[in-house]
Amino acid sequence: MASLNLEIITPERVVLQAEAASVIAPGIQGYLGVLPEHAPLITPLQAGVVTCRRRERAEERVAVSGGFLEAGPDQVIILADTAERSEEIDVEWARQARERAERRLRERPPGLDVARAEAALRRAVARLKAAGAI
């Protein structure tokens, strides 16, 4: 049965190298799925959860903060700004980050960079989802 070679890479390290049956990633227009024999594709990613479905294990989740996905017939390469495997995520820290971002967006202090606060909220939510905390 066909499979995909998945690599998730940040500027600092290779976060995940795995053989996958399928990959689901957070495209800018919604989540997209990649199966073996996929047509060539390059697309930007937003903050969210990349799900690697494996044959020998159910799945592995990685929180990404954005980047690009390149897919081909037998491989998927994700170049992410940042990425954390589910087991690396500090859930309490991510909850606090989400609460801080929500509070800033709710209170709207003078000089608030709304886009930056919204991006922080999306990153925190992605971490919590990848860790299975929400």
Swiss-Prot record:
Gene3D superfamilies: ATP synthase delta/epsilon subunit, C-terminal domain, F0F1 ATP synthase delta/epsilon subunit, N-terminal
Pfam short name (any one): ATP-synt_DE
HAMAP family, sorted: ATP_synth_epsil_bac
Keyword Manganese: no
Highest taxon in the source lineage: Bacteria
Family in the record: Belongs to the ATPase epsilon chain family.
Subcellular location: Cell membrane
GO function term, MF aspect, one: proton-transporting ATP synthase activity, rotational mechanism
A single GO cellular-component term on record: proton-transporting ATP synthase complex
Its job: Produces ATP from ADP in the presence of a proton gradient across the membrane.
NCBIfam families, per database record: ATP_synt_epsi (TIGR01216), PRK13446.1 (NF009980)
Alphabetized UniProt keyword annotations: ATP synthesis, Cell membrane, CF(1), Hydrogen ion transport, Ion transport, Membrane, Transport
CDD domains: F1-ATPase_delta
Assembly and oligomerization: F-type ATPases have 2 components, CF(1) - the catalytic core - and CF(0) - the membrane proton channel. CF(1) has five subunits: alpha(3), beta(3), gamma(1), delta(1), epsilon(1). CF(0) has three main subunits: a, b and c. In this bacterium the a and b subunits are transcribed but do not seem to be translated, thus the ATP synthase consists of the alpha, beta, gamma, delta, epsilon and c subunits.
InterPro entries from the UniProt entry: ATP_F1_dsu/esu_C_sf, ATP_synth_F1_dsu/esu, ATP_synth_F1_dsu/esu_N, ATP_synth_F1_esu_C, ATPsynth_dsu/esu_N
Keyword set includes Zinc-finger: no
Topology in the lipid bilayer: Peripheral membrane protein
Annotated protein name in UniProt: ATP synthase epsilon chain
